[in-house]
């Protein structure tokens, strides 16, 4: 598409004012006529030809354009600090910088002045001395060896020889075992007259294995490590190293090497046999899960709870047939799943029993009860039909729920909980809590009187109300102490109540005995009557005083009953009336006589009637 076509599409006029200029003529330069390889190289460039810049050659061009002087080198001596011979000196080439040396010398002279210059003949150390790492072997004294390092098969000289080899060869055990040549020194015998000791005893040499050398070295190292720093003060890496060396087992190391050697030297047939055994083991492991499930199902079938029903129903042929039909029906219903005690439901869906055995026993008992007057075959045919009817919807729903539920866990007994350390803690609320809050709740739930009683008991035991250091163990013991104190106070409360009831009944008994006693003769002198009335009044006052003492004790404990309190109040009123008018008869004597029981028809004296009135009022109030 040309420019004129574009202008026609865009409805633009011709932009040319004058005549169009003619095209410039291309001046085609003569192309070189190349042939062969030069032509192919020229064509590789395409439209952009390769520019070939001619190289300007110079005659006898200088090789090095730098005008710097050549570096100077010198032979410097040095030493190697890793070597034991300090006088051994070596030499190597080092670059010498004259300018830098001149500047350093001038600066040192200016800064130091008249100070003595350091020695120039000090030798530099080798750069490879830092790679010579010395192994630290355990060191011990004669006393330490005699105390903790003695061994039956090892002497001190041989142990020293082993440690020297370990230090020389940097604990490279193959080299140590290869260079280990211990010859025990000869023991001289008795000398002859001429002084000849030809009867010297040379002990036999003993060959040491690599594991024996390791075991002896690790034993010495672990014991000396524990002697220098106790085990309880070691860090975690030090303790791990100590445990590794102290529990080195040479026999296990030998077995490991033998196993590795046998694995490397086995033949192809043995390798194939081992591979086949490994494949068989994998198959066994793959089938083990299914085998375990079947075994668990069998155990569940055998480990059923004992039934309390009578087994006489299963002694007949009809009972056995009915039992077999029930078991088959239960298996079909559960689709060959495990018959757990909580998962088995009754096929009829009426009353689900606990186990399949119980269900079959109940169904069989019902069938045996219905077969009275029938033949055994009829009972055997009708019994299973009644128990194997179609299950309604509720039974199916219960079966599904039972399948979804997990297996119930067996509850542990008290002995098993103590054996396994099972504890039951209180449920904690949200947010942080303190142990002291739990103790404060034990006090806050009590009344003021009970809190005072608990505080008094704790003061008697010299136990503070608030714990100084409420740790978990201390808090637990404190809770047990408070529980024991509460039990003690409850027992005291019940004891006081029983004592008060016993005293009340004793007073009633004494009153009844006085009522049933025969009346005295009317010819008794008036002075005698007066003395008797005074004596009775004294008895009434003593009884009232006893009741008053009981009342004060009951007020202190705060646990007296309403009946006892009423009796005490009546006793106090009676004591006041008796003390005010001991000789005057009371106004309500006739009324009191009417209120007496039918057995007390004889006349009584003033003190007896008053006590009878008190006891009757207390009985009425107790009835109310």
From Swiss-Prot:
User: What GO terms are given for molecular function?
Assistant: transcription corepressor activity
Looking at the keywords, is Transcription regulation present? yes
Q: Which residue range or ranges hold the SANT domain?
A: 146-221
Q: Does the keyword Manganese apply?
A: no
Query: Ranges of Basic and acidic residues compositional bias?
Result: 504-514, 585-597
Q: Where is the composition biased (Low complexity)?
A: 356-371, 388-406
Its function, per the record, reads: Component of the SWR1 complex which mediates the ATP-dependent exchange of histone H2A for the H2A variant HZT1 leading to transcriptional regulation of selected genes by chromatin remodeling. Component of the NuA4 histone acetyltransferase complex which is involved in transcriptional activation of selected genes principally by acetylation of nucleosomal histone H4 and H2A. The NuA4 complex is also involved in DNA repair.
Record protein name field: SWR1-complex protein 4
Please give the organism.
Answer: Gibberella zeae (strain ATCC MYA-4620 / CBS 123657 / FGSC 9075 / NRRL 31084 / PH-1)
